[in-house]
Amino acid sequence: MAPAKADPSKKSDPKAQAAKVAKAVKSGSTLKKKSQKIRTKVTFHRPKTLKKDRNPKYPRISAPGRNKLDQYGILKYPLTTESAMKKIEDNNTLVFIVDIKADKKKIKDAVKKMYDIQTKKVNTLIRPDGTKKAYVRLTPDYDALDVANKIGII
């Protein structure tokens, strides 16, 4: 479909058009000159540009990472040395070798999940061979000797 042609009889006369332009020039609406910004600082800081949110077409990792420190990964094995046996008998305390990355709260939760016992507190130390030892003090309503029997330490 071709554009509609303008009717030659409706063309405005040149005098009216010139008067219209003269009026616009006189008011100054056509000649707006942008003023130059005066720089007072020596260093030039690049202006901040628009940063769009990331919208990836596909995830960059194939599968979400699994939790490597579950209760089985935290508690490696119970310690059965003579001093550990003395702790079981005298202080109501179980001694475990635990993962180096495990903290006291995770150790406490792991013992609760594995053996269904409440712990009073957990003390940890890192041995010279680089492993972490945890002293798990049980609450008075649990006997460490019975728990050690159930676990199979004794």
Swiss-Prot record:
This protein binds to a specific region on the 26S rRNA. This is Large ribosomal subunit protein uL23. InterPro entries: Nucleotide-bd_a/b_plait_sf (IPR012677), Ribosomal_uL23 (IPR019985), Ribosomal_uL23-like (IPR013025), Ribosomal_uL23/eL15/eS24_sf (IPR012678), Ribosomal_uL23_CS (IPR001014), Ribosomal_uL23_N (IPR005633). The keyword Nucleotide-binding does not apply. Keywords: Ribonucleoprotein, Ribosomal protein, RNA-binding, rRNA-binding. HAMAP family: Ribosomal_uL23_A (MF_01369_A). It comes from Nicotiana tabacum (Common tobacco). One of its GO terms (cellular component) is cytosolic large ribosomal subunit. The gene is RPL23A.
